[in-house]
Amino acid sequence: MPECWDGEHDIETPYGLLHVVIRGSPKGNRPAILTYHDVGLNHKLCFNTFFNFEDMQEITKHFVVCHVDAPGQQVGASQFPQGYQFPSMEQLAAMLPSVVQHFGFKYVIGIGVGAGAYVLAKFALIFPDLVEGLVLVNIDPNGKGWIDWAATKLSGLTSTLPDTVLSHLFSQEELVNNTELVQSYRQQIGNVVNQANLQLFWNMYNSRRDLDINRPGTVPNAKTLRCPVMLVVGDNAPAEDGVVECNSKLDPTTTTFLKMADSGGLPQVTQPGKLTEAFKYFLQGMGYIAYLKDRRLSGGAVPSASMTRLARSRTASLTSASSVDGSRPQACTHSESSEGLGQVNHTMEVSC
């Protein structure tokens, strides 16, 4: 890979072109951070607030960042021709190795939201050697049943597409209050994203199958995500039940579950500081970023109490200093005990 690919790229894949935006340049053998947005959004609408947050920029200067836009969802995308077959969720996942290979990434740390979280989870199931870790926000591992499908169809007949998508993105409380954030996203979804292309993506997401994952030991030959995973959901978010179920199907020794208070349906937008702090400790658990510096204190690394608990519950790293030379860390997978509590419960509710 050249020293810097900073900017926009259209990558050929077996299922069509993918629009990709690269920020930064490769840092030794460290993985790339690869993002995938939710349906109704693109990488800008989904991730700009999070990645522009000052503390997050302190993290990303240690990594190259690769933002992936689902086909036809980027700003200024041309409308697909009549009869175009939008890729299935499995095919969207199968497009990503072309991106990884094009830029010469050895492996990635994925950050996905909603539909993007589903795509990245499917990617990690099919190509586990390419994925170092996953942050999955608002993931629903379940396919749509007939009742859900009928409800979605009915909603599409009685609501505009942006309003239908908003009910997927935001909590009922946020929608009822018609918050400034909801109003802003209603306008941007209607004006920035090509509506015909969005309809195709929306239809395909609502035709998805179950992820087909099970916690190891619960069924014979159980399939699950092999990499460290951080699950994130806001309180009262539409995806809350799905994320809870996903947590029950993953390996508890390599999974952290963050339920974030006061964050609604888009925690990466409403609470970028909390999510950034959690992401720092997630990276530390995998052996990246040797120390954290709290900019508010001259003394340096003094994390909040809730994040200290999170760090204890994360998979312990044997080689956190390896981030200095960029070599791939090897994390042990035992869980630690908290004082007087016995086995740590990996479900961690952040309410700071």
UniProtKB/Swiss-Prot annotation:
Modifications the protein undergoes after translation, according to the UniProt entry: Phosphorylated in an aortic smooth muscle cell line, following PDGF treatment.
Source organism, top-level taxon: Eukaryota
Keywords (A to Z) from UniProt: Cytoplasm, Phosphoprotein
Biased segments, Polar residues type: 330-352
Compositional bias segments (type: Low complexity): 314-323
Residue numbers spanned by region Disordered: 314-352
InterPro entries: AB_hydrolase_fold (IPR029058), NDRG (IPR004142)
Organ and tissue specificity: Expressed predominantly in brain and heart (at protein level). In the brain, detected in astrocytes. Isoform 1 and isoform 2 are only expressed in brain. Isoform 3 is expressed in both heart and brain. Up-regulated in glioblastoma multiforme cells.
Localisation per UniProt entry: Cytoplasm, Cytosol
Positions bearing Phosphoserine: 298, 317, 323
Listed GO biological process terms: cardiac muscle cell proliferation; cell differentiation; cell migration involved in heart development; embryonic heart tube development; heart looping; negative regulation of platelet-derived growth factor receptor signaling pathway; negative regulation of smooth muscle cell migration; negative regulation of smooth muscle cell proliferation
GO CC aspect terms: basolateral plasma membrane; cell projection membrane; cytoplasm; cytosol; endoplasmic reticulum membrane; plasma membrane
Family, as annotated: Belongs to the NDRG family.
Function: Contributes to the maintenance of intracerebral BDNF levels within the normal range, which is necessary for the preservation of spatial learning and the resistance to neuronal cell death caused by ischemic stress. May enhance growth factor-induced ERK1 and ERK2 phosphorylation, including that induced by PDGF and FGF. May attenuate NGF-promoted ELK1 phosphorylation in a microtubule-dependent manner.
Name used for this protein in its record: Protein NDRG4
Species of the source: Homo sapiens
Taxonomy of the source species: Eukaryota, Metazoa, Chordata, Craniata, Vertebrata
